[in-house]
């Protein structure tokens, strides 16, 4: 009986000494999720306004002239696959012409509209294509510091995958904000936000 009484007193004493203070910060709870930049903007307009001017704030945008740092003054030639690439603006649309020439004649031609620009332009602008929500990297990048139009990193030396480099969730969340990703897919998105 004394053991039970002692055990009961121990439990009561121990529970009374616990620190049950609640935190003033709501974001430490496990059910709190990412709310996005526009939610923050409602209370922190000054921080939002300065952030969107940083490299991270300009990290991912739709492919429009005003978001591009690229100069498309020459074409790219892949000497291994024998493809020529010429990006250019058609009005506000960024398109990539991919073609092959044999005996001074065009034997293959594909025109693809570019949907997104990834990279702030501080170092590079790379380019993303959306095919019904499936995102892939286009085979050209503009290196702004050297003003060079060339293949993206990893596409050189015979590794040009053309339009087959999938933009997976890991790539997207590092270079952009949290997207609405289709679970079970490798590169399908329901919605892609614009910048971190």
Question: Which residue stretches match the model-derived regions?
Answer:
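Bacterial Sec-dependent N-terminal signal peptides
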Residues: 1-26
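Sequence context of c-type cytochrome heme-c attachment sites
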Residues: 19-38, 42-196
